[in-house]
């Protein structure tokens, strides 16, 4: 049994990275809890709503920049693994990548994911300023967890989670900037529960809060039960993950073992064939 102490940092982002970093420092700087994994939301760098793509590109950085450097220092100083997000400059300016970095206790980057499925629904066009990544995240071992990564809107794509579960993920972390709207909080909860139950994994959602975003950071266990729901407001939301529960649940519900994946792959190929 491995117990992993997790913190989800829920906050309202600024309209620049300087403003956002000030908020982040205020939340985590005075936090005394001992943690194994600290997770930050999507769009942590800034709230892009209504901003010009050129401005966002100007705020964006490379992985070796000061923004990621802050989180690498946080990891090594706190002796905690960190999942952080940024707008990363792409090869298609003024578009950026919506990027997640996974950092180990020593401050080393051990995983990078660029969001592949972009939020182009409900009147919003993320593709107007973001370039999609080209591959799913391959789970990594950090702080006692085999950890996968998906981003916000990708909760609506079960395949993103299924592939990582089949690759051994015990938990999938989901940095999210979940926009407000009718039934959006309920949608977030239902999707997180479904992804957990059908893959028998923990789903860890770190969500932004504020005038544009719902909050409701949460951890869902392998049975689909919400372990903690952060509600609204700026806060650090804590939970403890027990990795042994993943394997106990998979003994009772061997969904991954029973899946007819080769058959389904052929069905997918036929379904999407022009």
Segments from the language model and where they lie:
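Non-catalytic interaction/Regulatory regions outside core domains
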Residues: 9, 137, 150-152, 171, ...
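Active-site catalytic loop in hydrolytic enzyme cores
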Residues: 91-167, 180-190, 252-255
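Short loop/turn motifs at secondary-structure junctions
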Residues: 5, 33-34, 146, 168
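Short beta-strand scaffold segments in enzyme catalytic cores
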Residues: 84-86, 99-102, 138-140, 217-219, ...
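C-terminal beta-strand edge segments of enzyme domains
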Residues: 112, 208-274
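Cys-nucleophile CN-hydrolase/nitrilase-fold catalytic domain and related Cys-dependent amidase chemistry
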Residues: 17, 22, 26-106, 112, ...
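Active-site-proximal beta-strand elements of phosphoester/diester hydrolases
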Residues: 3-15, 39, 112, 139, ...
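CN hydrolase (nitrilase-like) catalytic-core segments centered on the catalytic cysteine
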Residues: 61-83, 156-237
């Amino acid at each position: 049994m491995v117990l992993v102490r997790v913190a989800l940092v829920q906050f309202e982002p600024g309209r620049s990275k300087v403003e956002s970093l000030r908020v982040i420092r205020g939340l985590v700087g005075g936090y005394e809890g001992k943690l194994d994994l600290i997770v930050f939301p999507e769009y942590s760098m800034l709230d892009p709503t209504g901003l010009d793509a050129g401005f966002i590109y100007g705020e964006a950085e490379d992985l070796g920049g000061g923004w990621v450097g802050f989180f690498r220092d946080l990891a090594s100083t706190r002796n905690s693994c960190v999942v952080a997000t940024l707008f990363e400059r792409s090869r298609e300016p003024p578009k950026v990548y919506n990027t997640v970095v996974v950092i180990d206790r020593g401050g080393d980057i051990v995983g990078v994911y660029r969001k592949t499925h972009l939020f182009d629904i409900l009147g919003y066009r993320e593709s107007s300023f973001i370039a999609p990544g080209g591959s799913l995240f391959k789970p990594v071992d950090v702080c006692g967890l085999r950890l996968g990564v998906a981003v916000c809107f990708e909760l609506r794509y079960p395949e993103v989670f299924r592939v990582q579960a089949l690759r051994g993920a015990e938990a999938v972390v989901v940095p999210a900037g979940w926009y407000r709207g009718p039934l959006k909080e309920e949608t977030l909860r239902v999707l997180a529960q479904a992804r957990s139950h059908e893959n028998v994994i923990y789903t860890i959602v770190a969500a932004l809060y504020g005038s544009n975003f719902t909050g409701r950071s949460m951890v869902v266990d392998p049975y689909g039960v919400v372990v903690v729901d952060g509600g609204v407001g700026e806060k650090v939301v804590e939970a403890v993950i027990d990795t042994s529960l993943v394997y106990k649940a998979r003994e009772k519900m061997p969904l991954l073992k029973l899946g007819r994946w080769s058959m389904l792959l052929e069905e997918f190929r036929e379904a999407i064939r022009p």
